[in-house]
Amino acid sequence: MAAPNVRSSSSFSRNISVVSSPQIPGLKSGPNGTAFISSGIRDLDRILGGGYPLGSLVMVMEDPEAPHHMDLLRTYMSQGLVNNQPLLYASPSKDPKGFLGTLPHPASSKEDKPTAPDPDQGESLRIAWQYRKYLENQKNAIDDYSNDFDMRKPLERQFLSGRPIDCVSLLDSSDLSIAQDHCATFLSKFPRNSSNIASIGRIAIQSFCSPLCEYSEKESDMLSFIRLLKSMLMVSNAVAIVTFPPSLLSPSSSKRLQHMADTLLSIKAIPDGDKELEKLLTGYKDINGFLNIHKVARINTQVPVILEAKTFSMSLKKRRFLALECLNQAPVDGSSGTSYGTSGSCSSKSGALDF
């Protein structure tokens, strides 16, 4: 008599909740059961492999000479409000609600709806019309996930009125108990207890270590808060982005904060009047700053991310739309040689421009 076929179970098993096909706007499925929300910048979503994974902590290191971390916050918050996602915003300002008036508005899309082709024009034109319709359907699917934002146009009231927005002032706070209570209450609304995602939450904390807050001298309390926030995010359908100035922290505390981040970014100012850099980079006059990617979140996998580049230029296309581009080295001596990195691909070699 043949022995029964018994499957041996291992103590090491992958605990991955299967994410069903997203039915709510602003959510996209990824590999290994990962779900993404958009950063509000399409270039950044593409670079990060889809956006910010649900349950992840994003930290942005500020540069006092470049306030472009505010642009990352603005697009992130606007994207959530456009997709009707609840928002918790905390900042060291007396009136944090005033910051909502600076959020950018999604760009108006000028859609040229295709008209049915003339039957007398032949089969080739009919196929071309169907292909054009397919491309527009693909574009509409992208718009449901992410938008291009006009940085010069404020977000209209229709996206602010009646939306679940919680604003918290960290000014003159002696400790982080108020912020901790707000985060715990907010994240309790988005438990990750099933494969079906009903709603998504977004948390944005600006200048976490600002000297305007009394708790800024208690580095151990700040580390404990970030550790607790990350643990709550891991069991929630939410994402938190926290900006902080590393220069105001001790080197050890700054490193520990960076280590706790799932996705770690930094902003660098572009030097004013740097003639050498102007000769080195193409489009130098259009560059507002640099974005460095130090770490990319990896959820449900141990495979590391290999980026084509880690430093990108930040610029405003048409002086309105925030864009990220690989750094391109200008031809030497006016020759038409190959640049350091083309627009289609970025060099992985380290150079003087790696910050």
Curated annotation (Swiss-Prot):
<feature type="region of interest" description="Disordered">
    <location>
        <begin position="99"/>
        <end position="122"/>
    </location>
</feature>
<dbReference type="GO" id="GO:0009737">
    <property type="term" value="P:response to abscisic acid"/>
</dbReference>
<comment type="function">
    <text>Component of the elongator complex which is required for multiple tRNA modifications, including mcm5U (5-methoxycarbonylmethyl uridine), mcm5s2U (5-methoxycarbonylmethyl-2-thiouridine), and ncm5U (5-carbamoylmethyl uridine). The elongator complex catalyzes the formation of carboxymethyluridine in the wobble base at position 34 in tRNAs. Promotes organ development by modulating cell division rate. May regulate mechanisms producing carbon assimilates or importing sucrose. Involved in the repression of the abscisic acid (ABA) signaling pathway during seed germination and seedling growth.</text>
</comment>
<feature type="region of interest" description="Disordered">
    <location>
        <begin position="334"/>
        <end position="355"/>
    </location>
</feature>
<keyword id="KW-0539">Nucleus</keyword>
<dbReference type="GO" id="GO:0009738">
    <property type="term" value="P:abscisic acid-activated signaling pathway"/>
</dbReference>
<dbReference type="GO" id="GO:0005737">
    <property type="term" value="C:cytoplasm"/>
</dbReference>
<dbReference type="GO" id="GO:0031538">
    <property type="term" value="P:negative regulation of anthocyanin metabolic process"/>
</dbReference>
<dbReference type="GO" id="GO:0043609">
    <property type="term" value="P:regulation of carbon utilization"/>
</dbReference>
<comment type="pathway">
    <text>tRNA modification; 5-methoxycarbonylmethyl-2-thiouridine-tRNA biosynthesis.</text>
</comment>
<dbReference type="GO" id="GO:0010928">
    <property type="term" value="P:regulation of auxin mediated signaling pathway"/>
</dbReference>
<comment type="subunit">
    <text>Component of the elongator complex which consists of ELP1/ELO2, ELP2, ELP3/ELO3, ELP4/ELO1, ELP5, and ELP6. Interacts directly with ELP6.</text>
</comment>
<dbReference type="GO" id="GO:0071329">
    <property type="term" value="P:cellular response to sucrose stimulus"/>
</dbReference>
<feature type="compositionally biased region" description="Low complexity">
    <location>
        <begin position="1"/>
        <end position="21"/>
    </location>
</feature>
<dbReference type="InterPro" id="IPR027417">
    <property type="entry name" value="P-loop_NTPase"/>
</dbReference>
<dbReference type="GO" id="GO:2000024">
    <property type="term" value="P:regulation of leaf development"/>
</dbReference>
<dbReference type="GO" id="GO:0006979">
    <property type="term" value="P:response to oxidative stress"/>
</dbReference>
<dbReference type="GO" id="GO:0009734">
    <property type="term" value="P:auxin-activated signaling pathway"/>
</dbReference>
<dbReference type="Pfam" id="PF05625">
    <property type="entry name" value="PAXNEB"/>
</dbReference>
<keyword id="KW-0938">Abscisic acid signaling pathway</keyword>
<comment type="similarity">
    <text>Belongs to the ELP4 family.</text>
</comment>
<dbReference type="GO" id="GO:0008284">
    <property type="term" value="P:positive regulation of cell population proliferation"/>
</dbReference>
<feature type="region of interest" description="Disordered">
    <location>
        <begin position="1"/>
        <end position="32"/>
    </location>
</feature>
<dbReference type="GO" id="GO:0005634">
    <property type="term" value="C:nucleus"/>
</dbReference>
<keyword id="KW-0927">Auxin signaling pathway</keyword>
<keyword id="KW-0217">Developmental protein</keyword>
<dbReference type="GO" id="GO:0033588">
    <property type="term" value="C:elongator holoenzyme complex"/>
</dbReference>
<keyword id="KW-0963">Cytoplasm</keyword>
<dbReference type="GO" id="GO:0002098">
    <property type="term" value="P:tRNA wobble uridine modification"/>
</dbReference>
<protein>
    <recommendedName>
        <fullName>Elongator complex protein 4</fullName>
    </recommendedName>
</protein>
<dbReference type="InterPro" id="IPR008728">
    <property type="entry name" value="Elongator_complex_protein_4"/>
</dbReference>
<keyword id="KW-0819">tRNA processing</keyword>
